Amino acid sequence: MKNEISIKFNFPEGILGFEEIKEFIIKDSEHKPFSIMQSINGEINFLVTSPFNFLEKYLPNIEEEDWLDIQTENEDEKVILCIINMHVKNYKEITANLKAPIILNKKKLIGKQAISTNEEHYLRYRVFKE
């Protein structure tokens, strides 16, 4: 069994649709550059990745209040992930939710799902371009 890195994050507000779940583990996936975000009880799993892996110029407009909610004090503490939709027949149809990114404070291990006010960001952004 290889060494798997997993980090537990507290989500005080839960995430959209799963507000009652407050703790998630983010762990490596064997399918890079993706990671798995799993509820502590193991019932809910999301595939996540950095949006910068497929969209270099991703500029989410995240409210300062959202960053304060997870107690970030500087840019080095901030991490942005997006949830991946794999429920497709063809890998070219895999999409990422750029509209509601997961924001993390990697120092204090606090997370939140925020809403990007950037009108160019969609709930279903195609990860693999033709």
Swiss-Prot record:
Per its UniProt record, what HAMAP family does this chain match? FliW
From what organism does this protein derive? Borrelia turicatae (strain 91E135)
Print the keywords alphabetically: Bacterial flagellum biogenesis, Chaperone, Cytoplasm, Translation regulation
Q: Looking at the keywords, is Nucleus present?
A: no
Q: What is its main location?
A: cytoplasm
Q: Please give the name of this protein.
A: Flagellar assembly factor FliW
Concerning Gene3D superfamilies, the annotation shows: BH3618-like
Question: Which family does the UniProt entry place this protein in?
Answer: Belongs to the FliW family.
Native organism taxonomy: Bacteria, Pseudomonadati, Spirochaetota, Spirochaetia, Spirochaetales
Q: Which GO terms describe its biological process?
A: bacterial-type flagellum assembly; regulation of translation
Q: Which InterPro entries match?
A: Flagellar_assembly_factor_FliW, Flagellar_assmbl_FliW_dom_sf
**Any one annotated GO CC term:** cytoplasm
- Please give the subunit comment from the record: Interacts with translational regulator CsrA and flagellin(s).
Q: Superkingdom, according to UniProt?
A: Bacteria
Which function does this protein serve?
A: Acts as an anti-CsrA protein, binds CsrA and prevents it from repressing translation of its target genes, one of which is flagellin. Binds to flagellin and participates in the assembly of the flagellum.
